[in-house]
């Protein structure tokens, strides 16, 4: 039986602790916050998108960075195993649009409670308010290679260990304690940490009219983002207007797919509000609506086309006098209005910061970590898992799957 210390009580850390304990080791889980799963509690707007039930090809293709590194981890512990784990732990789950898996209760607290029940059953020693200051090392006996032998806490206490698993998360949602401690531990161990940037993060928008639509969610729209004439992103789905710009699944995914240096630039964005219709079909629909409302003012004739919050903005951008009678609207004005519906314009003005990022892009360089075990190639008995690694995926439960899979593999492979 080895003494295993896991640093970080998030999803990867809890799964690593459970796997190591169920493999016969004595496990101490160190968490610097007052409770486990503080960031997990707020994921998925407090509902916790546990994983995604799509097939393995979709799983891999949803990983944006270093997907090949995850072959062993995903095949050793896949999404169905995650679903089975939680159901066996007393947490019923449900499958929603896009194969996103949520607890039936819609409460992330129930996910954390299920994990805590398993940690207790497996006799994992949980120590809260326990911030690690540094890792401890000794000579491994192998030429030029050291091994980790424990940790020192911020209060000076030393905890001896045969294996240490670093599962400290990234820099996103720093109010939950994600302050990048693991990057420092990795650098002190001799590891390379790639550039750290926010990902799955909203965009700022230049136009003031976004504020008029704050809180408005648009479903079944198509978003296209341009750099000059080049299309950088073109996807169908759901988005949200905020007081500063745009957010929601489509926008968060765009932030992960557009190169960070380019995302800093002003970029043109168009929203197709009626993607199921061609411009010609939409014109016929608008003509029909106008015919039915021919004696009404323009401002009172378009309620069937848009949510109420959007109508004043659409009127303003159309250039049509809101008090104009519908039967006085010219063909040119109507066609301009149709084009506006098919290409609602915004100017993106860079990404929001880490405090609003769901995940971190960048981390411990994966070429320095064994993908079959999650053990450091530089320091014996030191393991990394979860967001501290240079791994990230699009929104939809895929980032938590990375955490579960890499955490489980690290816990299973401690010696």
Features from the language model and the residues they span:
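Conserved N-terminal/central alpha/beta ligand/cofactor-binding core
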Residues: 32-125
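A glycine-rich dinucleotide-binding beta-alpha-beta segment and adjacent secondary-structure elements
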Residues: 127-129, 134, 312-392
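A conserved FAD-binding loop/helix module that cradles the flavin
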Residues: 172-185, 189, 390-415
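Glycine-rich loop(s) and the adjacent beta-strand/alpha-helix scaffold that form part
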Residues: 163-209
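An anion/pyrophosphate-binding glycine-rich loop and adjacent beta-alpha core
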Residues: 34-36, 41-42, 50, 56-57, ...
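Short hydrophobic core segments
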Residues: 5-7, 132, 158-174, 187, ...
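N-terminal Rossmann-like FAD-binding beta1-loop-alpha1 element of flavoenzymes
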Residues: 3-29, 410-414
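A conserved short coil-to-beta-strand element within the FAD-binding core of flavoproteins
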Residues: 128-147
